[in-house]
């Protein structure tokens, strides 16, 4: 089967699914398990040499592009977020390349990429950082603040958390990707 990925080393379209497949014994790492470039050979070995792994801008990069890749027949499976179909293939803005909902099979989600957090080091907290953190948290308190968060950050709220809770199962799945610890650990 030919796979359509959102891009090289992208969370939902590459790291989570491949980490899941490797970690659960479905896919075997091809190449040096300490080298991130082995991931490409692993994808091609598990799926197909004709799989789409965009690097940079192409019609098949991003969530929309990976779905389009599958729907136009360039691939057999799109590795995307579960919300992508509704974002691009429903309503008056649906793209002409979209298949009808009953023509696609959507699997149950098996992992989730963490949101894009605002990070700070608690050991280096100065008054300016504390003020910023409090201001961001206060935006959750009313509709005007929620509108600001949506307009600026495309999120509906800011939730205080720690790295371990925030990463959840993502860290476990991604740790199975060859070379991830050496390159990013």
Residue positions per predicted region:
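A ligand-binding cleft/hinge motif common to bilobed small-molecule-binding domains
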Residues: 22-23, 63-101
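Bilobed "Venus flytrap"/periplasmic-binding protein-like clamshell domains
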Residues: 1-67, 72, 147, 152-160
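Proline-rich low-complexity regions
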Residues: 17, 83, 114-117
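Structural recognition of the beta-strand scaffold that forms the well-ordered cores
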Residues: 2-6, 76-80, 119
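Periplasmic-binding protein-like
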Residues: 30-53, 90-133, 156-157
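Residues that form or immediately flank small-molecule/cofactor binding pockets and catalytic motifs
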Residues: 8, 111, 163
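An extracytoplasmic/periplasmic, membrane-proximal ligand-sensing/linker region
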Residues: 120, 124-185
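Solvent-exposed loop/turn segments at secondary-structure junctions
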Residues: 8-12, 83-86, 123-126
């Amino acid at each position: 089967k030919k796979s359509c990925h959102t891009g090289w080393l992208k969370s939902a379209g590459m790291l989570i699914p491949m980490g899941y497949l490797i970690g659960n014994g479905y896919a075997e790492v091809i190449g040096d398990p300490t080298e991130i470039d082995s991931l490409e050979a692993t994808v091609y070995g598990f799926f197909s040499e004709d799989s789409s792994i965009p690097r940079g801008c192409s019609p098949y990069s991003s969530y929309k592009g990976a779905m389009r890749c599958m729907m136009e027949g360039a691939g057999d499976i799109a590795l995307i977020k579960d919300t992508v179909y509704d974002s691009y293939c429903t309503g008056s803005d649906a793209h002409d390349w979209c298949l009808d909902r009953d023509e696609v099979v959507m699997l149950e989600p098996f992992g989730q990429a963490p949101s894009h957090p605002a990070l700070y080091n608690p050991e280096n907290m100065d008054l300016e950082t504390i003020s910023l953190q409090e201001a961001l948290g206060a935006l959750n308190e009313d509709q005007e603040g929620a509108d600001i968060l949506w307009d600026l950050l495309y999120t509906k709220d800011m939730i205080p958390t720690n790295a371990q809770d925030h990463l959840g199962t993502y860290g476990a799945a991604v740790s199975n990707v060859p070379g991830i610890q050496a390159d990013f650990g």
